[in-house]
């Protein structure tokens, strides 16, 4: 996802879709906005032909490069969470600094981020921790932004969290 569109193309696509940049990567929402904007921008409906072509080309470019996260709809017993009470975050002040002993989803994703030692930089989608979310989208590390991250993580399949 990090090499599909340039930063300028990403910003232009999100502007054409009428979505904020922090929703980049939320493919169900982007698809819905794309279909709505295609109806509005279509030249037969009184829209601008060049703008419609730009929207379609950028969206198709993004769509062609992104691998589907949902390769299958089934699940197995190995994918079931072994933690009985999974919470998003236990305590903002403690967990925002990374508590090693905490078992909340926020800390588990942060630990997963720290454990992967690769030479390539982390990108949103490979690592879904809050730190990567704020870095990737250029957001501040605040409780309000955390709530938008939580909503996105809430609709992500557990097996795609990479923990």
Curated annotation (Swiss-Prot):
Its main location: host cell. SMART domains: DnaJ. The keyword Cell membrane does not apply. SUPFAM superfamilies: Chaperone J-domain, T-antigen specific domain-like. It is found in: Host cytoplasm; Host nucleus. The modification N-acetylmethionine is found at residue 1. InterPro entries: DnaJ_domain, J_dom_sf, Papo_T_antigen, Papo_T_antigensf. A zinc finger (H1C3-type) spans 113-132. Residues 12-76 form the J domain. It comes from the Viruses. Keywords: Acetylation, Activator, Early protein, Host cytoplasm, Host nucleus, Host-virus interaction, Metal-binding, Oncogene, Phosphoprotein, Transcription, Transcription regulation, Zinc, Zinc-finger. A zinc finger (C4-type) spans 95-107. One of its GO terms (cellular component) is host cell cytoplasm. Gene3D superfamilies: DnaJ domain (1.10.287.110), Small t-antigen, unique domain (1.20.120.1860). GO terms for molecular function: zinc ion binding. The common region of ST and LT proteins comprises the J domain. This domain is essential for multiple viral activities, including virion assembly, viral DNA replication, transformation and transcriptional activation. This domain is also required for cyclin A-transactivating activity of ST. Interacts with host PPP2R1A; the interaction inhibits PP2A activity. Promotes efficient viral genome replication by accelerating both G1 and S phase progression of the cell cycle. Inhibits host PP2A by binding to the A subunit, thereby displacing lower affinity regulatory B subunit. Inactivation of PP2A in turn results in the transactivation of cyclin A and cyclin D1 promoters. Late during the infection cycle, ST may induce dephosphorylation of host MTOR, leading to the inhibition of cap-dependent translation. May establish and maintain high levels of viral genomes during persistent infection in cell culture. This is Small t antigen. It comes from Squirrel monkey polyomavirus. The lineage of its organism: Viruses, Monodnaviria, Shotokuvirae, Cossaviricota, Papovaviricetes.
């Amino acid at each position: 996802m990090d090499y599909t569109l340039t930063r300028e193309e990403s910003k232009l696509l999100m502007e054409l879709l009428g979505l904020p940049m922090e929703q980049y990567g939320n493919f169900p929402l982007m698809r819905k906005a794309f279909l709505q904007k295609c109806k509005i921008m279509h030249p037969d409906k009184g829209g601008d032909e060049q703008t419609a072509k730009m929207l379609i080309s950028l969206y198709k470019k993004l769509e062609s490069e992104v691998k589907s996260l949902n390769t299958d709809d089934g699940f197995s017993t190995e994918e079931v969470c072994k933690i009985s009470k999974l919470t998003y975050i236990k305590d903002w002040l403690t967990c925002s600094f990374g508590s090693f002993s905490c078992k909340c989803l926020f800390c588990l994703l942060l630990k997963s981020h720290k454990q992967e030692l690769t030479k390539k930089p982390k990108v949103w989608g490979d690592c879904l921790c809050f730190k990567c979310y704020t870095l990737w989208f250029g957001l501040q590390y605040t409780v309000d932004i955390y709530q938008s991250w939580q909503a996105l993580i809430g609709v992500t399949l557990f097996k795609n969290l990479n923990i």
